[in-house]
Amino acid sequence: MFGDTSEVLPVAEGKGSSWPTQRLTMTVAFADGDRTWSFDLFSKLAGLALLSFAALFIQRRLFHPLRKYPGPWLNSLSEIPAAIALASGRQQAYYRRLHSRYATSSGTIVRVAPNELSFVDPNAWQDIYNRKPPHMEKHPVFIGAVAKVGGAVGISMAPLATKDHSRHRRALGYSFATSALVEQQEIILKQVRNLISHLKVFARKEKAIDMTDWYTYTTFDLMGDLVFGQPFGCLDGEGPTEWSRAIIHVFVSGAWEQAIRRVAGVNTWAESVLKKILIPKKVALWRRLHFAKSRETTLKRIKDGQRNHKDLMYFLLKNKEARQNLSDLEIMINMVLLVSAGSETTASTLTAWTYFVCTNRSVHRRLLKEIRGNFKTAEHIVWENTQPDQLPYLEATIHEALRLVPPPASSQQRVVPPGGAVICGERIPEGYAVAVPPVAVTHLDINFADPTGFHPERWLPRDDDDWDEKFAKDKLGASQPFSLGPRACLGKTLAYFELRLILASVLWNFDIDLAHAKETKDLWTMEDDMKYLKGYLTWVKPPLPVRLQEVKREA
């Protein structure tokens, strides 16, 4: 039993306060009788904690090197607000609100954490991600979805300051060269045609279909075939496989781990404990499944050698320098990264693009005219016929979809190198984290007119009939969906190739409309900080139900 007692102590006459002094005690029942424990120790600890907080407050608010940059006072004291924003999937909305709130006092810089600055000046892309050596490295706190395995890292974590990153990028670059992608075209077209054949079945049945699911099935099968030499089987199975279902959890788990490291530090006991407590077991299990399956399939594909299937591994194994530069474990880690990033991110763009086009009738009409006017048959929709100069309006709509829903949903932090760096004219001391938030930078009116509206015309030449003068001051360089510099997305060309082929094929074959327009618009609205879109490094997408009507053509 616990009970409280208080003892009034007398005050020496003529000295001190006239108020009685009390000492709080607690009586605890033990088997061998009552013992009285004093709270003196607890009060001292509380006082010490209060003193520590006061010292922290004074240091981080009054003497910290980043003190002049505005932001919420709690963010300047603790990593917790930024960690919660990331773990909840709402970092993109939170950072946009912060930049909007502090725009008048800071211009384009906000202190989002004690040791981190966020920039929405388009010039920050160059200053942070594409600067001359010494480059800004990733910090262990901000490791993404794929971390170190058995002492080895993939291209995403290989340090720029060593030869490791260039070694990885050079080895993988052969597989992503334009010449290699042209040779891989049949693999891509096979999955695109498979998608179209399934969509035709739904169109004939006049049934609504969730394009969020079907685009995801397509990109998973496509990346499985390109990376591992075999599709996941989502399209033919008309649903997700166990493996493909695991991939989104790689990003969710990665976001949670990053949030935990923000608060607990790197490789600490607190990090280990919080991971076990906070990360759902299901998420951790799915992540382990993805790594196990990837390892097994990669090693099998390496053993198969240069079989007559021109996937990414074919070109990596074919090039002796590339094969010698990477160990089997490094190849496996890179394949995990490629299939994860290449499937979910492209599916997000496809789905967002379809929503925007279905809700903008004038855009839809011009796209139909361009695509159906350029191709007499579906077989003509190939690499050489879908280049930007041939389908300029399709290209503009893709750029606009990537601006509104960029593939990386969260900031990609970098650490200022020794000696400090100048970012957007500001001298930033070494050791601090800096980043451009990809959503905030494109959703603010300081960079784009009507920033949450879908306006492909902003990407068109000024002599185009749809050009509007209100977009004359748009800072198009603020949109960098594939980042810049030595860590820019290796699969950028592949992503554009997939987007052009899939989207052109869908609009050439079908008339498409939203099935549940009001509900779907609520889910996909860009207003209210995209309140139904969650970003865990990449996007967790809401449903997109549509109705398809197959276009009938004379034989």
UniProtKB/Swiss-Prot annotation:
It is found in: Membrane. It is an enzyme of class 1 (oxidoreductase). GO terms for biological process: biosynthetic process. Keywords: Glycoprotein, Heme, Iron, Membrane, Metal-binding, Monooxygenase, Oxidoreductase, Transmembrane, Transmembrane helix, Virulence. Pathway: Hormone biosynthesis. The chain crosses the membrane at residues 38-58, 141-161. Disulfide bonds: none annotated. It comes from the Eukaryota. GO terms for molecular function: heme binding; iron ion binding; monooxygenase activity; oxidoreductase activity, acting on paired donors, with incorporation or reduction of molecular oxygen. Its cofactor is heme. Induction: Expression is induced during the early biotrophic stage of development. Expression is positively regulated by the ABA cluster-specific transcription regulator abl7. Its EC number is 1.-.-.-. One of its GO terms (cellular component) is membrane. SUPFAM superfamilies: Cytochrome P450 (SSF48264). Cytochrome P450 monooxygenase; part of the gene cluster that mediates the biosynthesis of abscisic acid (ABA), a phytohormone that acts antagonistically toward salicylic acid (SA), jasmonic acid (JA) and ethylene (ETH) signaling, to impede plant defense responses. The first step of the pathway catalyzes the reaction from farnesyl diphosphate to alpha-ionylideneethane performed by the alpha-ionylideneethane synthase abl3 via a three-step reaction mechanism involving 2 neutral intermediates, beta-farnesene and allofarnesene. This is Cytochrome P450 monooxygenase abl2. It comes from Leptosphaeria maculans (strain JN3 / isolate v23.1.3 / race Av1-4-5-6-7-8). The gene is abl2.
